[in-house]
Amino acid sequence: MDQETVGNVVLLAIVTLISVVQNGFFAHKVEHESRTQNGRSFQRTGTLAFERVYTANQNCVDAYPTFLAVLWSAGLLCSQVPAAFAGLMYLLVRQKYFVGYLGERTQSTPGYIFGKRIILFLFLMSVAGIFNYYLIFFFGSDFENYIKTVTTTISPLLLIP
């Protein structure tokens, strides 16, 4: 691969690898809680603490393919930097959700809602990139610079709760 191609995806790859490490951390928590309760073997049933860790992990795993799809679509079709920033924010929010779920379930609600907003932002970036592609294809009009400016300007607003 040439440097330009790698430069167009390197931030997305970094966010993806960080998310893999986070998934490993979540899986380790499930395994640790299972072994704490059940000795050496892994079982899906156990104490309330294990049920919470297991459910929080499953909820994060269920949303993971959607996150990866919109992260890479937004980064490739629209703009890499705002997509990577939103991806990092999503990982922080997912961590907050996971830790919050281990305590009171109401503590996980802000992370869940914030995560949905970030997924929506990445989805809209992807749609804008696809829309721009078809504008170029059919009409020869390229709004890529405008879309990049808007997404770069809006992405810090994801920090507002």
UniProtKB/Swiss-Prot annotation:
Record-annotated membrane-spanning stretches: 9-30, 53-77, 81-102, 116-128
Topology in the lipid bilayer: Multi-pass membrane protein
Record Gene3D superfamilies: Membrane associated eicosanoid/glutathione metabolism-like domain
Domain of life: Eukaryota
Keywords assigned: Endoplasmic reticulum, Leukotriene biosynthesis, Membrane, Nucleus, Transmembrane, Transmembrane helix
Cytoplasmic side: 31-52, 103-107
Matching InterPro entries: 5_LipOase_AP, FLAP/GST2/LTC4S_CS, MAPEG, MAPEG-like_dom_sf, Membr-assoc_MAPEG
One GO location term (cellular component): endoplasmic reticulum membrane
Topology Lumenal: residue spans: 1-8, 78-80, 129-161
GO molecular function: arachidonate binding; enzyme activator activity; glutathione peroxidase activity; glutathione transferase activity; leukotriene-C4 synthase activity
Location within or outside the cell: Nucleus membrane; Endoplasmic reticulum membrane
Record function comment: Required for leukotriene biosynthesis by ALOX5 (5-lipoxygenase). Anchors ALOX5 to the membrane. Binds arachidonic acid, and could play an essential role in the transfer of arachidonic acid to ALOX5. Binds to MK-886, a compound that blocks the biosynthesis of leukotrienes.
Domain remarks in the Swiss-Prot or TrEMBL record: The C-terminal part after residue 140 is mostly disordered.
Entry's family note: Belongs to the MAPEG family.
Designated name of the protein: Arachidonate 5-lipoxygenase-activating protein
Organism from which the protein derives: Macaca fascicularis
Organism ancestry: Eukaryota, Metazoa, Chordata, Craniata, Vertebrata
Gene name of the record: ALOX5AP
